[in-house]
């Protein structure tokens, strides 16, 4: 009997082909654990600097609670990378680790998408999406870099291997060619995300960012072997769908009721919106996002919306915004200069806009309920965040000390806010006490009689921009150095001007020009009061350019005071 020939079956894939599947699941589990830990941290963690702890310990606790990217990304990637190098040889089985880089970048996307949900119902009570802006920015960069390294290392590996044709591996194989396209897109995104490029043309960055992210999510499953369709593609598509639904369900059309602007003096404007566009209650310092396009317009999805802090309270009859409209034009120019600026965005009465949603501020709940010793420091258009907070605490009977400090460049900005208070009938005299006051510091020169000489001093370039519409590059010119804060003991012979210019709030609002501003001097009573009350009752709010936020933060760290700041960075 003739023996049948021996048939040998050769495995289609090597023994390492499925080596990274479990690692992908591990990354997903770590992401889930991180989210649970984050929720517990915000629910039960302590952001208050303990008076008995060291400054270093307080700093670490605050950075951890504040979702500092360096701390949180360090913890996350330490956990993710623990089993990265395991079992397989780095020299003879390097392909395993090159593929692992790609799977790692894709497996981290669900976490990134989840943290940027607006609103995020899982973290809504103790977090706002603005808390995650710095984290999201650096997390996204790391994910894209990991994915790009995956592609670069494979190209290098094939290029130096004499037994492999780079053209055949990279171009002729459909799976790898798709990966090559992804690498090119990711590289373009990284270039657009460089600080100067992003600030020069934020619209371009935003469009590229969104399109590349969608392409990365949808094309990677075509490229990846073994597949990542379940659970990663399913999760990513589900989260993308939720993002889309949020921008549809909560959006509504709106028109501007009134706009008070005087471009010959200042770019600070007061805009009034219908009260009906927001719920019956919203927290003081909340903000809204507005798009100039309707939901059916593709530009609604491609271009960024514009965030604005709400200057009014929930009980007011309208929604008021006090904003600076971005412009390259100097005060005194025609309005056409503002409109012709491609970077500018301004609200017109004759147009219809889309309100995407409203969002709470990054203010702890216990601050509203327990705060009795309050200081609020703002610069420029940061008044839109500070004013509703001041009004909220001013109306509370148990508040023992309340002071708001507003630093501005010229008197016209104060006039506009004063007009807003008068128009809305907002007077504070009925509940006035010696421990409740507003101080306005003006860095430019003016006379109380004419109010026309608005000569701004030389300023420091903060070299920064802001995402939130209540701030923009106009506020970069507002530097603490204008107020001589670094030279508190200097014998400055510059005359100081101080007066209370209003009848309605004359005893409450004090306006000072060329005043040597020092935070410690202005907050002496606040600091004295903080030593006599419970630590949870003392809070300092800050909203303005980076130099002001840094000064306020340092003061709070030194004095062991609760600190809340509103920062919106590109």
Swiss-Prot record:
* Pfam families noted in UniProt: FAD_binding_8 (PF08022), Ferric_reduct (PF01794), NAD_binding_6 (PF08030)
Q: Where in the cell is it found?
A: Membrane
UniProt keyword annotations, A-Z: Electron transport, FAD, Flavoprotein, Ion transport, Membrane, NADP, Oxidoreductase, Transmembrane, Transmembrane helix, Transport
The annotated regions of Polar residues compositional bias extend over 481-505
Might you report a single GO cellular component term? plasma membrane
Give the record's membrane topology. Multi-pass membrane protein
- Record GO biological process: reductive iron assimilation
Q: Highest taxon of the source?
A: Eukaryota
EC number per UniProt: 1.16.1.-
Q: Which residues form the FAD-binding FR-type domain?
A: 250-388
- Cystine pairs annotated here are none
| Bilayer-crossing regions | 21-41, 70-90, 101-118, 142-162, 177-197, 204-224, 230-250
Report the principal subcellular site: membrane
Q: Where does the Ferric oxidoreductase domain start and stop, copy by copy? A: 101-219
Q: Which Gene3D superfamilies match?
A: Nucleotide-binding domain of ferredoxin-NADP reductase (FNR) module (3.40.50.80)
**GO MF term (any one):** ferric-chelate reductase activity
Its function? Probable cell surface metalloreductase. May be involved in iron or copper homeostasis.
The record's similarity note reads:
Belongs to the ferric reductase (FRE) family. AIM14 subfamily.
Which proteins does it associate with, and in what oligomeric form? Interacts with ribosomes.
Indicate what this protein is called per its UniProt record: Probable metalloreductase AIM14
Species source reads Saccharomyces cerevisiae (strain YJM789)
